[in-house]
Amino acid sequence: MTFKMESVPIQIGTRRRRRFAARASTPPVVVALAVYVFVVIGRVPDAFPSVHLAIVTAGITGVLALLGSNRDLGRLLRIPETLAVLALFGLSIVTIPFSVWPGQSLTFVTRSYITLIFLFLVIVYCARSARAVQILLYGLLAAMLLLEISLMLWGKGDRPLVTNTYDSNDIAFIMVCGFPLGAMWFLRGRGPGRYIAALTSALAVTTVLLTRSRGGLVSLCVVLAFLLVRASSRERIGTAVVVLACVLILGAFGSKEYWERMATIWDSGGGPAVSAYDATGVWGARWPIWRASLWLMLEHPVIGVGAGVFDIAEGLSHGGAGKWSTAHNAFLQIGVELGIPGLVLFIFLLYRTVKNCHIVMRLARQHPQLSVEAWLASGVELSLYGFIVAAFSLSQAYSSMLYFLVAISVVLARLASQRNRLPGPRGAGSPGGMAGFSGRGADGAEHAL
């Protein structure tokens, strides 16, 4: 009897020591990668162009990844998502000579697109535990906070800008994609990080208002609806409170001019504060360019017009006269620039991300130890739905958020499949496409991919 009473605190102490040891042993590459996520998604280099922060942080992360890893690169390259990402990158390279402006395509691929490929590969290669994924989420939340605070302090005018490369629609897009991850962390996560996530998510809703982005509002409403519908019976009250809080923020801070502009989502017209462009409604403003995009894709179905040159191809399609427009649709953007093969690969990545999240949530029902992976996967899935809705009205085919979400889904699926292969009553078998790539994670456990 005495032995049993003394064994309890010993076991508790052992678990605590293991938990603290896991936190202390977080690989430096994960921290460096979180900083890289912050730099890339937060567009920090725009504020310090002479420092080349993206190159510096990428270099540090790459060196740490190569020095601290014992993984088989060959197996990494056989993952379906990796193959699709590299195939898209390969298409962007081989189509450069056939681009309507080869020099611009070369610049885009070597200066912009390659950073997204690196972001995806290094996340899949280095993130080996649920804790590592959470650390990367800190990088995302920090990027969101930077954009939120910058917009609130320095954003001026009807369509505020706070970076050289993000317009108001882009900022709203980042908020919508990041909001579900922060909300799920607050609802189902533990520790002080959930309160940081809650603050960031609340500010994200306010930021969507400040951007006056119609696509941002529609995407946010869809995400809120999914958040409420997908909540379990235990979480429904808490989720309803979160959704209600978001609605109250929209109602409290949305001005009359804001709602007049939002009314043009469904109908043309609007009040006196609505510009002539907005008064045509979303359909009236977007349909001409969408129709032109479809024709461009049909004219260049195999190799496209070249990566990063949609607006140039669109301008040349009507002789250079008038306005040269962006796609305002990620699916048409990738289809025009990289042809139908690029569009197919793009849709495949979206499909695989949703599938990975479903794998994690299904296995989590069998293994309670996967509770953290489960809410992370749920957040990633909701974020992807926000991306898809926003992608129908924004040119976000080469978004860092997309490659971040796809990579995180791959990491979570490998962690869940590794848990499923452990000996036990329900540990046999694994989801297809995830076996055969193992390494020691940040928590000291083996994680297979």
Regions found by a protein language model. Give the residues of each.
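A membrane-periplasm/extracellular boundary helix in multi-pass inner-membrane enzymes
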Residues: 153, 206-210, 231-277, 281, ...
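Juxtamembrane membrane-water interface segments that cap and precede transmembrane helices
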Residues: 40-46, 154-164, 284, 322-333
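Loop-to-helix entry and N-terminal half of a specific, functionally important transmembrane alpha helix
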Residues: 29-40, 144, 356-393
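Membrane-interface micro-motifs in multi-pass membrane enzymes
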Residues: 49-57, 108-111, 163-176, 215, ...
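Alpha-helical transmembrane segments of multi-pass inner-membrane proteins
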Residues: 3, 23, 61-63, 89-97, ...
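Long extracytoplasmic/lumenal interhelical loops at the membrane interface
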Residues: 273-291, 295-338, 359-368, 372
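Membrane-interface helix caps and helix-loop-helix hairpins in membrane proteins
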Residues: 47-49, 98-107, 156-164, 209-210, ...
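Transmembrane signal-anchor hairpin modules in multi-pass inner-membrane enzymes, especially those
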Residues: 1-104, 118, 124, 128-141, ...
